[in-house]
From Swiss-Prot:
Species of the source: Corynebacterium efficiens (strain DSM 44549 / YS-314 / AJ 12310 / JCM 11189 / NBRC 100395)
Lineage, broadest ranks: Bacteria, Bacillati, Actinomycetota, Actinomycetes, Mycobacteriales
Protein name: Protein RecA
Family the UniProt entry places it in: Belongs to the RecA family.
GO BP, one annotated term: SOS response
Stated role: Can catalyze the hydrolysis of ATP in the presence of single-stranded DNA, the ATP-dependent uptake of single-stranded DNA by duplex DNA, and the ATP-dependent hybridization of homologous single-stranded DNAs. It interacts with LexA causing its activation and leading to its autocatalytic cleavage.
Amino acid sequence: MATKKTTKAAPKGDDRQKALDAALALIEKDFGKGAVMRLGDENRPPIQVISSGNTALDIALGIGGFPRGRIVEVYGPESSGKTTVALHAIAQAQKAGGIAAFIDAEHALDPDYARKLGVDTDALLVSQPDTGEQALEIADMLVRSGAIDILVIDSVAALTPKAEIEGEMGDSHVGLQARLMSQALRKMTGALYNSGTTAIFINQLREKIGVMFGSPETTTGGKALKFYASVRIDVRRIQTLKDGQDAIGNRTRAKIVKNKVSPPFKIAEFDIIYGEGISRESSIIDLAVDNGIVKKSGSWFTYEGDQLGQGKEKARLFLKETPELADEIEEKIFRKLGVGKFAQTADELTDDPVELIPNVDFDDEDDDFDASTAPAGTFTEVTTEN
């Protein structure tokens, strides 16, 4: 007669807990304390952020700025303001006492323009690498030092593999840059989290050939960055600002197409003034009027009974000359919208229903989404621009 196969019974009750405690002790011995932990054991602080220097973008990001220890991708067409957004973040990090690094793979950083945006160029670490491998190796070493608060790589498209640089014109190097990015991001992600460094990758757009439906636009460097990025921002120039016949800047729209730290698909619109960068005061005025903090009567802007100026430009200049007032109005905006340090905690949340209407073009991010399968009432009708 064949012998019956017996299996060892799983430990029960206290025995299971003892077995788990023994396993955890062994793991901590081999890999260090904190290698495994219960999620509820540690009172984790809110996600730390680096302000973008732009009130509208801080609000769209949902947490008051770029998350620390995460990867951020900023992409868009040429001359849309991508580098300007990154330089403003560097300026804010430096103002808070942080150390910033800029990997200038495009060899196009303008120190004079950076200074006008508030960047301390004397303290800014800059590298102009020869190859993509060198750029990413330098970035990885800086992150692992634990001393860098913000790292900007400009741009992914300019991270040219060594084999391509040393090869002949016309040689095929299919997928080489994508493999390079995938390997680098696998190495850097954990180091970024441990060091609290924010890494901003600036990327360019390309067009896929033969696309019949949906957007033909895609970003360079393969798909790895799309997966590893906690935040992806699409930056577009939507309008030229003029003073009479002279162009003085651009109206820019930034759409948060991916956000792992807050609800995505929010949109921020702001002004970029030539030679000055993003106008923080202009964003404050727009948001304050929208939220009833600043009153607009005709062309006059009024705050708590005091006139800020006639016309938006004069009100903007007044706030620029009185930064304390601008800070006060900005704080009231953040408080009203519950952004950053004013975000509601679990104890403050209510059961009142909240209606969200995402500003999203469904052709932009997820081509496999089928709206017909969504529950009734999931979406409201939105009007998109041509």
